[in-house]
Amino acid sequence: MEKYMFLFLGGDPSHLSPEKQQAHMQKWFDWVEKMKNEKRYVAGEALMPGGKTVTGPKKVVTDGPYAESKEVVGGFFVILAKDIDEATKLAKDCPDYDLNGIVEVREVVKFE
């Protein structure tokens, strides 16, 4: 099995009612539990909105990324899958698609 990273972009549930937000989070908990039971889940975290960016040779620091952007990374998982196709299939179970979320699937490089 190889390691793959899911980068979660968009999919902001903040406009939902508290009850719908809770139901949405339960879908996430269920998805993580399913992957843990299948021995696929390695790690994952949600990220706070905002932050800082450091850019270029002069290491210019600016505010951002901005939470209003549709392509801000909101979190990540590292999972195990046999190949990119299987990882992509697993990513299709992400609960954020109902909120127009995006999941970027990337293989983790092995340095040996």
Label each region the model flagged.
Residues 1-112:
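Conserved, structured core segments of small domains
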